Structures are given as structure tokens and as C-alpha cells.
A protein has these predicted regions:
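Glycine-rich phosphate/dinucleotide-binding loop and adjoining beta-alpha-beta core of small-molecule
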Residues: 69-73, 77-83
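Glycine/serine-rich phosphate-binding loop and adjoining beta1-alpha1 elements at the start
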Residues: 2, 8, 79-127
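Redox-cofactor binding/interface segments in oxidoreductases and associated redox assembly factors
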Residues: 5, 66, 72-73, 92-93
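N-terminal beta-loop-helix "entrance" segment that forms/cooperates
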Residues: 34-57
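Short phosphate-binding/catalytic loops that engage adenosine nucleotides
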Residues: 31, 55, 112
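Short acidic low-complexity segments
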Residues: 54-67
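Glycine-rich phosphate/diphosphate-binding loop of Rossmann-like nucleotide-binding domains
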Residues: 6-42
């Protein structure tokens, strides 16, 4: 699978969807991981750490959305990101859809497969 990790663009959001350690696990299992350049800086991870973990650094979020089968984020996609989601592309992130009618409709219209972290449970119903 080709997994993309764009830089978070929501104000005050400094986290990133995958750490270098997570990238290493994914790449060692045969996945290709694309990480937006400087995407992890505010979370304490530099580009070299991602490269050493096996990630390919990409200049623009648009290229990550265009080239990835799976997108891994932290926060809900903003409107310009929603427009980049492709049909059948899998998006893992917090979505908080209950209070976001416009976001909900945009995701429906994208025909992507959007999985909200806050709704994922184990076999016992635990988050």
C-alpha cells in the first residue's frame, strides 16, 4: 500500500499522523510511505528521521493526496484537503462529524472511505 502523511494545517495542531517509528514498521512490511517535508518538525521529528525510517519526502500535500491509497492525519481535513480526497481513497483521522455538517457532506461527496479514530473500537466495544 502507498500511505501518505500530509502536514497538519489546522491552526494550533502540531502533531503528525505517523511517527518515524511507525513509518519504519510500515515500510519494513512492504508499504511505501510518503511524508510531507517538514511535516513532523513541530512534533519533534525532522526530515532525516523520516528518511532513515524509509519514508519518501514529498514537497506538497497535493502530491501526497494524488499518489496515496491511504491518508493518515491527526485532525479533520479542512475544506481544501477535502477537495483532494479521491474516490475510494482511505482517510484515517479524527473527524468529529457530529458538529460538522459541511465537512460531512464534503466527505460523502468525495466518495472516499473515511474512518474516524473516535469511532474505532475493539471486539469489546472499547475505544
Amino acid at each position: 500500500m502507498k500511505i501518505g502523511v500530509p502536514k497538519e494545517i489546522k491552526p494550533q495542531e502540531n502533531r503528525i499522523g505517523l511517527t518515524p517509528d511507525s513509518v519504519k514498521v510500515l515500510t519494513s512490511n512492504g508499504n511505501e510511505v510518503l511524508v510531507e517535508k517538514n511535516g513532523g518538525l513541530e512534533a519533534g521529528f525532522d526530515n532525516e528521521q523520516y528518511k532513515n525510517a524509509g519514508a519518501k519526502l514529498v514537497d506538497k500535500a497535493e502530491d501526497i493526496f494524488n499518489d496515496s491509497e491511504i491518508i493518515v492525519k491527526v485532525k479533520e481535513p479542512l475544506s481544501n484537503e477535502v477537495k483532494m480526497i479521491k474516490e475510494n481513497q482511505i482517510v484515517f483521522t479524527y473527524l468529529h462529524l457530529a458538529a460538522a455538517k459541511e465537512l460531512t457532506q464534503g466527505l460523502i461527496d468525495s466518495k472516499g472511505v473515511c474512518i474516524a479514530y473516535e469511532t474505532v473500537t475493539d471486539n469489546n466495544g472499547r475505544l
